Amino acid sequence: MDTELLKTFLEVSRTRHFGRAAESLYLTQSAVSFRIRQLENQLGVNLFTRHRNNIRLTAAGEKLLPYAETLMSTWQAARKEVAHTSRHNEFSIGASASLWECMLNQWLGRLYKNQDAHTGLQFEARIAQRQSLVKQLHERQLDLLITTEAPKMDEFSSQLLGYFTLALYTSAPSKLKGDLNYLRLEWGPDFQQHEAGLIGADEVPILTTSSAELAQQQIATLNGCTWLPVSWARKKGGLHTVVDSTTLSRPLYAIWLQNSDKNALIRDLLKINVLDEVY
């Protein structure tokens, strides 16, 4: 039997209205009616009496109701258990593009290197904006978030992983801020509070991106400057700090749900340094 038919039956019996059941199930009213007819044909009985807007369960419908509830409950439990089994070795890590490019890519390599060959995890490296990742974490669609700003929510656990240094870089030596176009690389909401004082309140970015690789590649073309992690920029080469600029220290946090069933695993993974240089 198609569980969607039982699901539709339960929703109509709950709302006693085909239109409201359709809205709740994100279906058309005709689709709901069709499903109920299918179920009635399979069982060989009428499940509802229909008189204008007055929809009631028949005696057969009343008898089916507890069985339908039990079947759907069992089906949901089975789906959850199977999904949990299939996800047992999966672990999702979310961060912005710039964090993956500048530091987390190397950490991911270290995680794989330190895995037991027989119990190795299947990692998912997820790239998205911080706000989206916080939502995914809250909804249990993400296991671990790496970010520069810890969300102030009681249900989250956090661990400070260390700090990294940002400097303002351009593609040629001996350049001043006034000679360059500004490329905004997103380093978290609180970074924008410092940005105006470090760049200039009237400075309008010629480009905004969440990718350090993209920003770095566009610096020369756009005669620009952007904030990049010092350790990453040194490895890249061909980059020079802007003469009349300063540096800025940024924290890096690991965030996860307090009641996550992967708490012990998360703490083990975080024993492997996320940053190449921790201070």
Swiss-Prot record:
Signal peptide stretch: none
PROSITE patterns per record: HTH_LYSR
DNA-binding residues (ranges): 18-37
A GO MF term: DNA binding
Keywords for this protein: DNA-binding, Repressor, Transcription, Transcription regulation
One record GO biological process: negative regulation of DNA-templated transcription
Domain HTH lysR-type: 1-58
Entry keyword annotation includes Transcription regulation: yes
Annotated InterPro entries: LTTR, LysR_subst-bd, Tscrpt_reg_HTH_HdfR, Tscrpt_reg_HTH_LysR, WH-like_DNA-bd_sf, WH_DNA-bd_sf
SUPFAM superfamilies (alphabetical): Periplasmic binding protein-like II, Winged helix' DNA-binding domain
NCBIfam families: PRK03601.1 (NF002946)
Similarity field: Belongs to the LysR transcriptional regulatory family.
UniProt function note: Negatively regulates the transcription of the flagellar master operon flhDC by binding to the upstream region of the operon.
This protein's name: HTH-type transcriptional regulator HdfR
Species name: Escherichia coli O17:K52:H18 (strain UMN026 / ExPEC)
Lineage, opening ranks: Bacteria, Pseudomonadati, Pseudomonadota, Gammaproteobacteria, Enterobacterales
